[in-house]
Design a protein with these regions (language model features):
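Gram-positive cell-envelope targeting signals
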Residues: 1-12, 16-19, 59, 78, ...
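Extracytoplasmic small-molecule ligand-binding "clamshell" domains
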Residues: 6-82, 155, 245
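Periplasmic-binding protein-like
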Residues: 22-24, 100-108, 188-230, 249-255
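Bilobed "Venus flytrap"/periplasmic-binding protein-like clamshell domains
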Residues: 23-27, 37-50, 105-160, 178-182
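Extended ligand-binding regions for polar small-molecule ligands
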Residues: 42-52, 112, 119, 123-132, ...
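Acidic, polar ligand-binding/catalytic clefts
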Residues: 46, 58-120, 193, 199-206
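Short helices/loops that flank or line small-molecule/ion binding pockets
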Residues: 50-54, 60, 65-79, 92, ...
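Ligand-binding clefts/hinges and TM-proximal coupling segments of bilobed small-molecule sensing domains
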Residues: 55-58, 133-155, 192, 227-255
């Protein structure tokens, strides 16, 4: 299909909103058994659009980099990828009202060296996605501490692959958020262990610990409508109800 503009309309006369996702961050957003995007981020956004009858929401699964470039080109109107906030991205995109809170963990092989800080990881190998906040944090550490650099392998593989590589020893560690860790461990029970990332170091990953939907700069009106709906969903307890269905020990801003 051709690129959608914000004015494209469906047969029903509704404005079609295309939401793009990398769909590889379970339990937040992933491809479900029916080959459609599923997870907390998707359930929340669907609940938002239930309150916005003038719009028809469509999802497109693509790689992480294409989510961002597609927002810039106007192909997509919303990015759905459990986005954290950072200044660079904040200058390029509009952010929604936060709908979730995140905490990050270092993941290492069970029984091996525990990593409790970036300092502990000096000289070790890390695997992560290109352009995602945890990889950016490792890059920032390396720039500031060239004598304690961490070896980075970039991959667009699913997070489960990163955990498998840590478990089999081909990578020393990865960094993911706690809810994802719990979700993958419940499903696969990898031979790995976790340590919480200290709060001061977590700020290297994200300037705050919330998750957001992102929009192109020209979608201020859509962002306002989404924000209004998100606040209503928080106040009426819907966000908490959706989070209870997820496999995690998490805190949602609805809770």
């Amino acid at each position: 299909s051709g690129s959608a503009s914000k004015d494209s309309s469906s047969d029903s006369g509704k404005t079609v909103i295309k939401a793009a996702t990398g769909a590889n961050a379970k339990p937040y957003v992933y491809v479900g058994d029916d080959d459609k995007p599923a997870g907390y981020d998707v359930d929340v956004l669907n609940a938002v659009f239930d309150k916005l009858p003038d719009y028809e929401l469509e999802y497109e699964v693509t790689d992480f980099g294409s989510v961002l470039s597609g927002l810039n080109s106007g192909n997509y109107q919303i990015g759905v990828n459990n986005f954290s906030y950072n200044e660079d991205r904040g200058a390029s995109y509009l952010y929604s009202y936060p709908y979730d809170k995140i905490s990050y963990v270092f993941v290492t092989k069970k029984g091996g060296k525990e990593i409790k800080s970036f300092e502990d990881a000096a000289g070790l190998s890390f695997e992560g996605g290109t352009g995602i906040s945890v990889s950016n944090a490792v890059e920032a550490w390396n720039e500031k501490n060239p004598d304690k650099a961490i070896n980075i392998t970039y991959s667009d593989a699913d997070t489960s692959v990163f955990l498998q590589h840590v478990a089999d020893g081909s990578q020393d560690f990865t960094i993911i958020d706690l809810a994802m860790y719990n979700s993958y461990m419940e499903e696969f029970n990898y031979d790995v262990q976790k340590n919480d990332i200290p709060e001061d170091e977590a700020k290297m990953i994200a300037e705050n610990s919330y998750a957001y939907y992102i929009f192109p700069q020209d979608q201020k009106d859509l962002r306002e409508q989404v924000d209004k709906a998100l606040k209503e969903l928080k106040e009426d307890g819907t966000l908490t109800e959706i989070s209870k269905k997820m496999v995690w020990s998490g805190y949602c801003t609805g809770g």
